Structures are given as structure tokens and as C-alpha cells.
């Protein structure tokens, strides 16, 4: 893992959160792998039991385009948690969410392939 790789991993994570906060759908689309799945654990509205809610690359780009993150405070912190050859895990702490990103190298690009997130505080 080179210093350039680490910088590229951090750039992918930074692009993700900054695109969300600014409504930049093109930037979001560029940092995500086309097969991305973004998941959260939500309580089912009927049963009250935990269930998995998932978004695709397309869902994420459209939510970004709609400005769903633009009303949030702009502060965030990106931490590279671990790296190994062609994969990495990063954590993004923002005012509202904690996101764990799995990032992988595809040829010379690092892209986010999966996200698991949860609100900082339950609503």
C-alpha cells in the first residue's frame, strides 16, 4: 500500500461525504462503484424488529441530486481504519451519521463498494 493509495482511499471517502453535503450527484456517482449497496439497520414500522434497509448506486446518486444531505451541518472526519492490498475500510463521522465504507481498487481507481451506516442519535 503506497502513500498515493492511502491518499486515494481518503479522497474516495471525502468525495462521498462532501458530495452528500453539497448535493453534487456527479461527484457522488464518480466515487461509488456501480454495484454499490448502502445499508442501515432500521426498526420495521409494523413489527418493530430490526431489518436491513438498502440503497443502490442509483438510489444514492438520486438522493444526492435531490439535496437530501444539503441541510446538514458541514463538519466531518474521515478515518482510514484498515487497508490490505486492494481493499480498505474507512469511517466517516459527520454531525448526523457514522458511515463505514468498504473501498476497493479497480485498476487505478479506488471506489466505494459498500456502506453500513447509522445515525449519530436515534430519532
Regions found by a protein language model. Give the residues of each.
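Enrichment for repetitive, rod-forming helical segments
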Residues: 23, 45-46, 98, 112
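Short beta-strand edge/turn micro-motifs at domain boundaries
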Residues: 89-91, 98-123
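Amphipathic alpha-helical interaction segments
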Residues: 24-29, 65-68, 118
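Surface-exposed, charged secondary-structure patches
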Residues: 4-8, 37-97
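Short secondary-structure capping/turn micro-motifs that flank functional sites
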Residues: 36-37, 121
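Residue-level "edge-of-site" marker
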Residues: 33, 41, 116-118
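Short, low-complexity N-terminal intrinsically disordered segments enriched in polar/charged residues
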Residues: 1-35, 46, 50-51
Amino acid at each position: 500500500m503506497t502513500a498515493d493509495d492511502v491518499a486515494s482511499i481518503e479522497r474516495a471517502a471525502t468525495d462521498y461525504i462532501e458530495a452528500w453535503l453539497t448535493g453534487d450527484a456527479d461527484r457522488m456517482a464518480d466515487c461509488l462503484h456501480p454495484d454499490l449497496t448502502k445499508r442501515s439497520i432500521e426498526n420495521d414500522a409494523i413489527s418493530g424488529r430490526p431489518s436491513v434497509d438498502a440503497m443502490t448506486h442509483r438510489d444514492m446518486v438520486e438522493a444526492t441530486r435531490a439535496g437530501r444531505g444539503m441541510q446538514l451541518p458541514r463538519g466531518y472526519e474521515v478515518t482510514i481504519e484498515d487497508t490490505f492490498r486492494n481493499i480498505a475500510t474507512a469511517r466517516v463521522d459527520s454531525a448526523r451519521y457514522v458511515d463505514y465504507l468498504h473501498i476497493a481498487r479497480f485498476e487505478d481507481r479506488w471506489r466505494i463498494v459498500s456502506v453500513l451506516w447509522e445515525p449519530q442519535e436515534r430519532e
